[in-house]
């Protein structure tokens, strides 16, 4: 197995410009493909997950012109021209879920599959919602999981659709993005959310991007979403993808742990991503942090001890960036508790179990619950821990921060960061100093 040895480092400073957001990149690609007109997308993320989406769109007949981080998409006016396709989508949830929904109403014969882990990630609640529209979707192997076979159905949105909100917000995102493509005799298409909706900021991203493409969605609290009929996706002409706020979290934490000043460009107060809320968590932990509209700068910790303060936090709104808090908790002056993170279990790996296992390798005492984790930092970090990454980009990036504790750390399978940030380690090493 490939590995990368990092550190020991004691400082981190400099400036980094973030790659584009994965969540925004794949949403914008699909919306541009479904729109009327040509869309120029800039600062598009180049990663495994976006390549999977681009390849799928090309197979579906979408015309794309790529040049570096710019992509020009010629829209299909709401209907893909390819009526049959076999789509391998890797482990990209941001491609599998929305494409499943869009293809379910497209009137063709499609197969959607991915890596073995993708076939363990639930999709049943989305399929149930799409079947309420008349979609014909079959499971090829296990009920509730990919691979999927999609066939033409009698599609309409006359009756409200109900979808669970407590497993993944991507199910609701996928339905909302698809409803403008579906005819309705009632004048509106309605989605009812059953139970507590998790990861609400990701729904905010979806609604704001749909609006950029000409679709207004009426939100009634977090339990009902109404799409008035007669709307069609229209290209905004051009759209820039803001920096990835989840990826920002590693560098912001590095600025706190390594003294800074470390400036992250590409996200800030004007961001539409919920994970920018990680900055508030860092401030609660004692970091010296300043923020502009599209930048954030961290200058170490405001305590004489140089240690972060432990926190007890509900992480429902920042599930991905919360992983960074878990590793930063190794540098806190007491036990940190992260709550409401059940969604970790259905991500690229079971992140709760993986996080607990790897934190223990560097000396932490960890209590892992169904939807929480408690991290008690060690007196001294254990050097030369070999961190397993579970083919999960965020596990690899999070644990790079251990090297800022003055100990070397080994990251196994470092290339898994290709999912969202292929040159992450080069960028991290450029900012870290012994």
Curated annotation (Swiss-Prot):
It is an enzyme of class 2 (transferase). The active site is at residue 320. Gene3D superfamilies: Enolpyruvate transferase domain. Its EC number is 2.5.1.19. Phosphoenolpyruvate binds at residues 22, 93, 121, 170, 351, 394, 419. Pathway: Metabolic intermediate biosynthesis; chorismate biosynthesis; chorismate from D-erythrose 4-phosphate and phosphoenolpyruvate: step 6/7. GO terms for cellular component: cytoplasm. Its main location: cytoplasm. It catalyses: 3-phosphoshikimate + phosphoenolpyruvate = 5-O-(1-carboxyvinyl)-3-phosphoshikimate + phosphate. GO terms for molecular function: 3-phosphoshikimate 1-carboxyvinyltransferase activity. 3-phosphoshikimate binds at residues 22-23, 27, 168-170, 199, 320, 347. Pfam families: EPSP_synthase. One of its GO terms (biological process) is chorismate biosynthetic process. Keywords: Amino-acid biosynthesis, Aromatic amino acid biosynthesis, Cytoplasm, Transferase. InterPro entries: Enolpyruvate_Tfrase_dom, Enolpyruvate_Tfrase_sf, EPSP_synthase, EPSP_synthase_CS, RNA3'P_cycl/enolpyr_Trfase_a/b. SUPFAM superfamilies: EPT/RTPC-like. Catalyzes the transfer of the enolpyruvyl moiety of phosphoenolpyruvate (PEP) to the 5-hydroxyl of shikimate-3-phosphate (S3P) to produce enolpyruvyl shikimate-3-phosphate and inorganic phosphate. Monomer. Belongs to the EPSP synthase family. This is 3-phosphoshikimate 1-carboxyvinyltransferase. It comes from Paraburkholderia xenovorans (strain LB400). The gene is aroA.
């Amino acid at each position: 197995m490939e590995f990368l040895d990092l550190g020991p480092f004691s400082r981190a400073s400099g400036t980094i410009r973030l790659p584009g957001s994965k969540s925004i990149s794949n949403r914008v690609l699909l919306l541009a493909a479904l729109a009327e007109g040509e869309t120029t997308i800039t600062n598009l993320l180049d990663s495994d997950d976006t390549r999977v989406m681009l390849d799928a769109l090309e197979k579906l007949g979408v015309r794309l012109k790529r040049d570096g981080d710019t992509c020009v998409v010629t829209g299909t006016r709401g209907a893909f021209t390819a009526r049959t396709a076999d789509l391998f989508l890797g482990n990209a949830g941001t491609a599998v879920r929305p494409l499943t929904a869009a293809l379910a109403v497209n009137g063709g014969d499609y197969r959607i599959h991915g890596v073995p882990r993708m076939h363990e990630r639930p999709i049943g609640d989305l399929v149930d919602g799409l079947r309420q529209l008349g979609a014909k979707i079959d499971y090829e192997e296990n009920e509730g999981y990919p691979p999927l076979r999609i066939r033409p159905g009698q599609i309409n949105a006359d009756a409200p659709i109900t979808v669970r909100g407590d497993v993944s917000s991507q199910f609701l995102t996928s339905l909302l993005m698809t409803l403008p493509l579906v005819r309705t005799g009632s004048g509106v298409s309605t989605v009812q959310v059953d139970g507590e909706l998790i990861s609400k900021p990701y729904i905010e991203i979806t609604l704001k991007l749909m609006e950029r493409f000409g679709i207004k969605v009426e939100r009634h609290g977090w339990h009902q979403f109404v799409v008035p009929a007669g709307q069609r996706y229209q290209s905004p002409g051009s759209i820039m993808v803001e920096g990835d706020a989840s990826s920002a979290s590693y560098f912001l934490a590095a600025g706190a742990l390594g003294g800074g000043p470390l400036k992250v460009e590409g996200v800030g107060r004007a961001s539409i991503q919920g994970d920018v809320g990680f900055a508030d968590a860092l401030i609660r932990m004692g970091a010296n942090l300043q923020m502009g509209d599209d930048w954030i700068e961290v200058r170490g910790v405001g305590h004489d001890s140089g240690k972060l303060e432990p926190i007890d936090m509900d992480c429902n709104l920042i599930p991905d960036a919360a992983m960074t808090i878990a590793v930063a908790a190794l540098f806190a002056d007491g036990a940190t508790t992260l709550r409401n993170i059940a969604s970790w279990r259905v991500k690229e790996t079971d992140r709760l179990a993986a996080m607990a296992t790897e934190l223990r390798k560097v000396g932490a005492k960890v209590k892992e619950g169904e939807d929480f984790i408690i991290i008690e930092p060690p007196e001294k970090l254990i050097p030369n821990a070999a961190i397993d990454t579970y083919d999960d980009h965020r596990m690899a990036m999070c644990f790079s921060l251990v090297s800022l504790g003055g100990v070397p750390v080994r990251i196994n399978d470092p290339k898994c960061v290709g999912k969202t940030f292929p040159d992450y380690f080069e960028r991290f090493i450029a900012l870290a100093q012994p």
